[in-house]
Amino acid sequence: MREGLAVAEPQYEPDDLDRLLQLRAMYEVRGPGLLTWPSVPMPVVRTASIMFTDIRGFTRLTERFAHDPAGLLEVLNAHLKKVLRSIAICGGVVEKFVGDGVMATFGAGGEQPDHVDRAMAAAIGLIGANEALNRKSAADWGFRLEVGVGIASGPVVVGAVGSADRSELGVLGDVVNVAARLVTNAGPGEVLMTGTVYRAVADRLQSELTSQSAVRGRSGSLEIYRMALLGGRGELT
């Protein structure tokens, strides 16, 4: 995707997205425009980009809908549809839902040499799509949904997690933990990324170095970059 990262509308039906929201992972879906995990020997080690998303202030939002849980689900699903669409357009796979956010992989289910580009394009796309949703939520619901993103790239292992009685396909590795930690520190409309991710797109992306930083739950420090998409705008040229 290095040439022209313009995000086009996906070619699949809304029903596919509705079905997707009821599943744990995108690879379980068989539908036009939705990726499936290929049949490959397991486990397999690949270099991939991992992305986590998270709604900022979701706890306060749940309090707002304390007496209308169905309304909360409506709001969350409206947001997740935007997120899933951006990920699918860029060739990513939703590995699982994590509370109000998602964990998506690029390059884990199959070789994608441009997995970093794809992850960054998806992040830019989903924040922009969420901003469009905010125009509706502000008018209809009286509040905004703010989303943060964390991205890390590196080696991961893809394989069955569990036992013969019950197992599921999982993606494991240090970069998964790093991306999960980064998203907790990403502000509204921000993408936090590791130095590996930044250097892969630095010549085409404006970003700010936030300094060497310790990430809770791991030893040592990480080179972390922050990209702020004010108003949900950004591009990868």
Q: What do the predicted segments below correspond to?
A:
Residues 116, 167-172, 209, 213:
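Allosteric regulatory "coupling" segments in signal-transduction proteins
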Residues 156, 185-237:
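Cytosolic regulatory/linker segments at or just downstream of nucleotide-handling modules
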Residues 98-99, 139-150, 191-195:
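Acidic/histidine metal-binding catalytic segments
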Residues 105-115, 149-168, 188-190:
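Catalytic strand-loop-helix junctions within cyclic-nucleotide turnover domains
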Residues 40-121:
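Catalytic NTP-binding/metal-coordinating core of nucleotidyl cyclase/transferase enzymes
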Residues 152-153, 161, 174-195:
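Catalytic/regulatory signature loops of cyclic-dinucleotide turnover enzymes
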Residues 74-92, 108-149, 174-175, 180-183:
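Alpha-helical scaffold within the catalytic cores of cyclic-nucleotide enzymes
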Residues 1-48, 205:
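Regulatory cytosolic signal-relay segments
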